[in-house]
Amino acid sequence: MRISVLSLHTSPAAQPGQGDAGGMNVYVDQSVRALAAAGHVVDVFTADPSGIDGLGGRAGTLQIVENVRLHQLPIDAANKDELADAIDELALLLLDEPGFTSADLIWAHYWISAEAALRAQELRSQESLSAVAEDATRSGARPRIVVSMHTIGAVKNRDSETSHERPQRLEAEERIASAVDLIVANTPAERRDLIHELGADADAVVVARPGVDHDLFSPGDRAEARTVLGLAREEFVVLYVGRMQFIKGTDVVVDAISGLREDNPHLASRTRGILLGAVSGQEAPTGFSPYLRELNSAIAAEPSVEVRRPVPAHELVTYYRAADILLVPSRSESFGLVAAEASASGLPAIASAVGGLPDIVEHGYSGVLIADHNPRHWAMALERMLLDDELRRELALHAADRSTRFDWSATAASVLGALDVPDLAPTTTMTTTEQMTGTEETTTAEEMSNTEETATAEELNPKPRLVGRGC
């Protein structure tokens, strides 16, 4: 099968943890590799304003792996909001791409991509824009459109008092939910939100769990990892991985470690908090928001906390192996990439009981869930876990064992299986001509930097959870 994957506002080749790059980038990267491994031909399209490393800021094509090409569309947009205002232009650009117009299936990630896909389909039905479109119209064929929202505007507004998503997005997501052929939810919690918040037809929503790259994310030697990272063997390491955002709860991490210092100064003196991430979205070019200014002041005032740059996956696993505890204090989270990666690496998490996180972290078994974002409760949970070596070892073992059920090939198979299209058999290879189609310059993945793989995971059938304050 020929599959067109849209990740328009952010490239799957971008470094997670900064700008608009996060778990979705990893999801797209890993899922298209799984589709290709299953014998499908995949064309991925992005209009990421930051461009694709290896193309020097130009529009063009990058060969990721066999049967997977990444295309940078030529659009003049400085950020995600400008892309959202250019849906018609994006649709027309897609209709100029053979990898889009010849697709049997379109898988759109995020609402901007879904809007562009639906608009392109509308334009194709109005008039024949190419020979490919004419053939499709005459034969009655129409590519199925699948969407993964990843985040839902209404849910972000519900879960965070500082979130004010644009009305354009809220209206578009409701429209998308009723127009596409299939909606992919990462967790049962997200499925409920899609149905209740967007009015999606329950029969059109499938839960397809993201996977974990177990060849990369696995338990390892802590002492060796700390030597690599320049960390002392005798200190406790508390890790946060992600963008510096209110919705991600970065402030809770800093405040919890400061609270630990008040409650147990000796323990705090032996604890190092590492924030592995950078600012998000438009923060860097426009100047820091009041939230980031306050966060920066709090970090400067807390001697146990340091900030390090985001790192590619092959380095990130070393941080997971070196740390004692991962903190995931998200205020809204449709899935929870880092909690799943950490679990596979044998690192237990203290996480918020929101969104998809309870599907990854089983309270009292593979980690700890906290029902609110009161730093005092997080400090209490942190102190208890740091003081109990046996508890951490037990949680780590369970976390690693629990993560084995997550697999990217199963993710891809779940989505394709939900479509139930037996006549769309795998296309075994991309021809040489197809690999060089168009006037774009094609570059191999080896010629670009930061195309490392990361992954995430959750269980398929969540059980009721005991959610605690602190522990």
Report each predicted region and the residues it spans.
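N-terminal subdomain of nucleotide-sugar transferases
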Residues: 1-66, 467-471
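Short hydrophobic beta-strand element within catalytic cores of glycosyltransferases
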Residues: 348-351, 361
